[in-house]
A protein has these predicted regions:
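Structural marker of alpha-solenoid helical repeat scaffolds
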Residues: 75, 109, 140-143
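Terminal, low-structured helical/coil segments at or just beyond the last alpha-helical repeat
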Residues: 24-33, 134-163
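Residue-level recognition of tetratricopeptide repeat
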Residues: 79, 113, 145-148
């Protein structure tokens, strides 16, 4: 009888201590954000600052995003999405030449990337190279997407690029 009671107490103590241990601390199962993910968050925030007419705050976010994207691109090279955002942030910071280089690197990986083709087309319009913008539009022609219509309107002068 005493043995059964002692065993019951020991089992209870063991179960209670394990339940407390299971609830304490971080199990490591939560996924931490990558530099790419953090950069995308900064870009979204920067776009919101632009909508609120806060260009200095937007620029700071684009700068932070660009630094994170450069790090991400070094660690995981040849990702079209990373190169798209690198082109975008670089262009937003006024460096059209290097922005174009990032876009072209991305197109070398995925020539039909919708975002890169649209943004590169917008860059070409902004730098008065309409013939090259039309080439990007032709790539988007069959996509049945908003990006095609936006770029078409920008090339036609019916819409001003928001980027």
């Amino acid at each position: 009888m005493i043995n059964k009671l002692l065993i019951s107490i020991l089992v209870s103590v063991f179960l209670i201590s394990n339940s407390f241990a299971a609830g304490s601390g971080d199990s490591g199962s939560s996924k931490s954000k990558t530099k790419y993910d953090m950069a995308v968050t900064h870009i979204k925030t920067a776009k919101n600052f632009e909508k609120k007419n806060k260009p200095k705050k937007a620029r700071k976010r684009y700068e932070k995003a660009q630094k994170l994207l450069i790090q991400s691109n070094k660690k995981f090279p040849n990702k079209a999405e990373t190169l798209n955002y690198l082109g975008f942030t670089t262009r937003k910071l006024g460096d059209f030449e290097n922005g174009e280089k990032y876009y072209l690197q991305g197109l070398a990986i995925n020539p039909y990337h919708i975002g890169i083709n649209e943004y590169l087309g917008e860059l070409y319009v902004a730098t008065n190279r309409h013939n090259l913008a039309v080439e990007r539009l032709e790539v988007l022609k069959g996509c049945d997407c908003k990006e095609y219509n936006d770029l078409k309107a920008i090339i036609a002068g019916e819409k001003i690029s928001k980027y």
